[in-house]
Amino acid sequence: MSSEKEYVEMLDRLYSKLPEKGRKEGTQALPNLIIFNIGNTTMIRNFAEYCDRIRREDKICMKYLLKELAAPGNVDDKGELIIQGKFSSQVINTLMERFLKAYVECSTCKSLDTVLKKEKKSWYIVCLACGAQTPVKPL
């Protein structure tokens, strides 16, 4: 009987240390992208902040987005992404959602608390929440 009691106490202690399910950490509450069309140019004002929140380098996010849009662009000193071409905010948000699913979200626990790691020619998403390591398609 005492071993069963100890087991239950250890389980209770374990569950008390686990994070609450559905609780959102810092990276979970992502800012909305601020997108402007000026003439034939599209600007994303808070691009650098967004990339910082998802723990990805600006150039990796930019490379994915520009490749999908088939348009040239660059990040300026203020952290704004400037894309040559007129694109709707809906198109850009859809592409960023795809980027999140493919290169940020942990496939095991669905957390956005991950880092992108490159070993030789392989890319991996390493989850900081559950420790899973998932291979992804190279950029």
UniProtKB/Swiss-Prot annotation:
Keyword Disulfide bond applies: no
Signal peptide feature range: none
Keywords: Initiation factor, Protein biosynthesis
Pfam families (alphabetical): eIF-5_eIF-2B
One GO MF term: translation initiation factor activity
InterPro entries per record: IF2/IF5, TIF2_bsu_arc, Transl_init_fac_IF2/IF5_dom, Transl_init_fac_IF2/IF5_N, Transl_init_fac_IF2/IF5_Zn-bd
HAMAP family (alphabetical): eIF_2_beta
Subunit structure: Heterotrimer composed of an alpha, a beta and a gamma chain.
Family note: Belongs to the eIF-2-beta/eIF-5 family.
Biological role stated in the UniProt entry: eIF-2 functions in the early steps of protein synthesis by forming a ternary complex with GTP and initiator tRNA.
Name used for this protein in its record: Translation initiation factor 2 subunit beta
